[in-house]
């Protein structure tokens, strides 16, 4: 099995978990999305990170210390990821997903507001 420690997907998962600790909003569609789009071995971890969606979708003020983490998440989603060796993974579906397009757009808007 491939070592995932340096994989950018795991990097994002870990950052999202950090963010999720401060938010308790539950998003049912997050669980549905990950079960269809992530490899089974990391889907469970991702489901625990619904706070990432809460931060990107809600209108709450983002703490200054969170801005850099959000920026890294956005940059990671934009980059051409190294695909993991798992036939279940469908990076293209994530790339083309309206759900993730909206998360990227919301995150950009929130970061722009922080700069004003």
Model-derived features with residue positions:
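Amphipathic protein-protein interaction modules
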Residues: 49-105
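Short terminal alpha-helical segments
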Residues: 1-53
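Generic structural concept
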Residues: 9-17, 71-74, 100, 104, ...
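A structural signal for well-ordered alpha-helices, especially hydrophobic packing surfaces
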Residues: 20, 74-81, 111-115
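Intrinsically disordered or highly flexible coil/loop and linker segments, enriched in small
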Residues: 25, 83-86, 116
């Amino acid at each position: 099995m491939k070592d995932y420690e340096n994989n950018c997907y795991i990097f994002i998962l870990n950052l999202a978990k950090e963010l999720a600790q401060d938010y308790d909003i539950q998003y049912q569609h997050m669980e549905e999305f990950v079960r269809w789009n992530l490899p089974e071995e990391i889907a469970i971890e991702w489901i625990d990170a619904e706070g990432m969606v809460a931060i990107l979708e809600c209108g709450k003020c983002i703490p200054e210390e969170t801005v850099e983490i959000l920026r890294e998440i956005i940059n990671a989603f934009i980059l051409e990821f190294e695909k993991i060796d798992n036939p279940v993974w469908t990076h293209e579906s994530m790339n083309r997903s309206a759900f993730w397009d909206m998360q990227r757009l919301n995150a950009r808007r929130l970061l722009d507001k922080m700069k004003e």
